[in-house]
Amino acid sequence: SLHDALPILLIFFLCNVALFVSAQSHMEKGLQSISRSSTEAIINFLAGDELQGREAGFHGSRVASEYIVSLLQWIGVQPLNESYFQPFEAYRKERQKKGRLEVHPDSIAKLKQEVHQKLSMRNVLGMIPGKNTKEYVIVGAHFDHLGIDPALDGDQIYNGADDNASGVSAVLQIARAFVASGKQPERNVIFAFWDGEEKGLLGSKYFVQTCPFISRIKGYLNFDMIGRNNKPQQPEHVVYFYTAAHPVFGDWLKEDIKKYGLRLSPDYRAWDNPVGGSDNGSFAKAGIPIIWYHTDGHPDYHQPSDHADRLNWDKIVEITKASFLNMWKMSNEREF
């Protein structure tokens, strides 16, 4: 009778619900862990005056790198190597006008006459090991900025909230989303935080030049400035650069915006020769397919006025979600 069949039907129904929940849950668990409150906490710390503008080779950027490591440990992401830090050295000549520094990663021998000071820098590198330990994908952002210029009247600290505390917050939240998903990715996922970008992409160049598995890196996703409105009337605007030879990168974002109702209106830019003034250039030169999120220029770019209170927080969250979905596919899809 139906009465006797009810428990069986109920069990069947519950099993189906469980199947449905597990089918949707891993990626969506990750997606749900991305929050505006975490975005704000990370950026407000990194772009605070105490961090003195995070100039590469100076105290503020070292504090920033320690902070990033402490969050990776808390999230549960292991270091890529024995340490989370990848130290490297750069050399500088005299202080230039405007307190900017010129840095030469070349051999010190060539520069002996000119070297004014040696700068120690360090990338931060975490990893979630994949099932296929031969292949890697990387998501990264630079954490350094322009430091302090004592010659300026008024505000002398280049806080770099958009450039690039915004990008750092995205990489950290994507790391947490992978852990929160509860599912091991197919490929190794590296979470990279570059030092010395403002001085000539030094950290990412050093990583690419010294990486023993460069030929097994399948893709790199970059953030540089993902927090501002280029035009007030277009709060959802973001430029989405990607390697033209991989048109599926464009399809991924279009599909996910529809599927998850993400509030983004991307300017899709397929690049035949992806270079550009950010760390994606270091990877593109090595022939690695790239994606780069960038919300475009604004009057506070490279000014002491690049403050956290001018950011579009919701946009950063939406970009973080979209790029987590990109990385989920990049780490799990067989081909792209």
Which residue ranges define each predicted feature?
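A non-catalytic alpha/beta surface segment that caps or lines the substrate-entry region
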Residues: 54-127
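Short, small-residue-biased leader/transition segments that mark boundaries at the very start
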Residues: 1-6
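Alpha-helical metal-binding/catalytic segments enriched in His/Glu/Asp
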Residues: 124-126, 139-145, 149-200, 323
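Metal-dependent peptidase/peptidase-like ectodomains
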Residues: 194-295
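Acidic/His- and Gly-rich active-site-bordering loop/insert found
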Residues: 46, 72, 114-150
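His/Asp/Glu-rich mid-to-C-terminal helical/loop segments that flank catalytic regions of hydrolases
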Residues: 26, 299-336
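Second-shell loop/turn segments in exported
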Residues: 26-33, 49-59, 74, 111-115, ...
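N-terminal capping segment at the start of a domain
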Residues: 28, 33-63, 75-85, 89, ...
